[in-house]
């Protein structure tokens, strides 16, 4: 795995939600999603110092929240490899 072998790489983990529920609950849920991915990767051998986790709640949708399909797409975690 790239993050285990390369010291100069990191991973930005971003949690997102749909717009169902309150802003504060969605922010907490999105952070929990990102943290769950971070914890999984740490168990797989990735150093915690290489991982950054963020929760954005419903603030960055990639689809409409007007349909069940769109809301499903917005409930996600995105990861970006970073160079440190």
Locate predicted features.
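Periplasmic OmpA-like peptidoglycan-binding domain that tethers envelope proteins to the cell wall
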Residues: 14-84
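Periplasmic peptidoglycan-binding/tethering modules of Gram-negative envelope proteins
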Residues: 1-10, 82-84
């Amino acid at each position: 795995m790239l993050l285990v072998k390369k010291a100069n790489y990191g991973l930005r983990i971003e949690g997102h939600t749909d717009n169902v529920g309150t802003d504060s609950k969605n922010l907490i849920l999105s952070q929990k999603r990102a943290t769950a991915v971070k914890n999984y990767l740490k168990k797989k051998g990735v150093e915690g110092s290489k991982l950054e986790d963020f929760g954005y709640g419903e603030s960055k949708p990639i689809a409409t929240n007007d349909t069940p399909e769109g809301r499903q797409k917005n409930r996600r975690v995105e990861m970006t490899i970073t160079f440190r």
